């Protein structure tokens, strides 16, 4: 009876609210949203207004006026906007002057001019009308590149999505390269076509090396293997701006006695030495020099970026001391957050294992690398995740904690680190949100003040009367993110796949093959997530995850923090729901989408709470408590099922595909029904 009721409930929800799988992609291809104008608004005395019949010399901007603002505009010269290239401006710089009779734009080049037009669009979106305040602005993007992976599909970039990326201020894309015309999207990809399509909308292309070439340059066949792999790629794709190397993806048989000279799959777990990919080996500079020589033979201007991500658990000085030995011209990329040690206010200490925004992330490790790069006059990049997402929640579209993100944006602008460029997302990709909108302005010299900007966004999206209520919800969500505990058990466990994570105390060990994952996924669950709670040494070895057993005191302190998070997320959701009740049309729909994102975070935290409480009860043999939290988690998963049916982006991640979608959550519910039966019914 319970099973039939759950299925019936799910079917009713799916009929009334369900969005087809991948329906969110249609939203990603909307370059200009329709109907953004509030027809009741009139221009002020100090504003210029675009009127019907206006001519502008940019087709994209004309489309914006027509579609978003309802202004009948056409493309033509000597119209309301005059745009010219000014050689006297710095790279990426533009000047906008709004007068009573029109707008003048000067840009350092074509890309700068396009960013100027996008800025005009942003201003009118905030105004909700085709009006611009009179005055003069000088603006410049602080960082270049600002590169992102695709949030449409793993290494999939349709034309309109590329345009959307450019509108949000990013200036580069990055995708996996495995071989000539082979990416994470599969073989026979038109890589050069993608490079050209990106170039046409003002985006550079970086290749993320996932090339299989286990070779040492000092070995007899080593340089031949390097030429046969990296040389082929550079020759085939010379239009790429650069290539990114990271330890785990460029393993080689190092001769450094401090490491195991084998591939990851051949690691000896009884040998305490790390693998070459996870250690600053003394012969990394030799390997890089050999690869660089081959790449530049075929593509002389291809930039080489070495990302130190996998070194975060090694001695900071050891890592920084190796950087001066790298070949000249190699850019260094550090990582924010990884390796940070956070002490929470209840005494819990967390060693942050992977990408997190629970801390701004400016560790001594990161600072030492930045200093070494600066001393050697090298370009220093940062893996910042500031497109809006980290591994804190694996299948959410973005983390809605703007005031916490601000700490990172502000830190990156600090000149002591000398940051030149950013990687702003890994393979979990980019989804447009108010977070990336705020980041764009924060990363612009001459940009709008943060407090002013976020207040205008709140008023635009939820109405002036609701702005303060919405701001307070965002403050709560931001404040509570510092309570997140970024250890491996959380990031590879309940927070990776949220309410799809199994509650299985008393059941058989779950095998990865049992999990209903799309077989086309680039990353399988065997690599991406632990499905048993808590995970054990065997699972950790299988996935090369640092295993740290958590004692009961740690779990209880962690639960204190999680329960705060649950309250704060729930309070924020409640406030936004109240605000949304006053809205209608597209504004209401967008508000409900954000509410769903907030509630997904709330439900994910609830899953973590129920798992920890259930485990502690199971450990002490308290079956009634196990069942109590089983019922709580069953209800939580049912509520989450409605969320993922309503918004097809929730529960999805580009490399994992649907890891917590309707199918996965229903699978979890069925397992719980089989394991606990009628005990799941509310007493």
Residue ranges: model-predicted function:
Residues 9-18:
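Hydrophobic h-region of N-terminal signal peptides that target proteins for export
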Residues 19-141:
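Contiguous, structured surface segment used for ligand recognition
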Residues 24, 235, 274-683:
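Substrate-binding groove of N-acetylhexosamine-processing glycoside hydrolases
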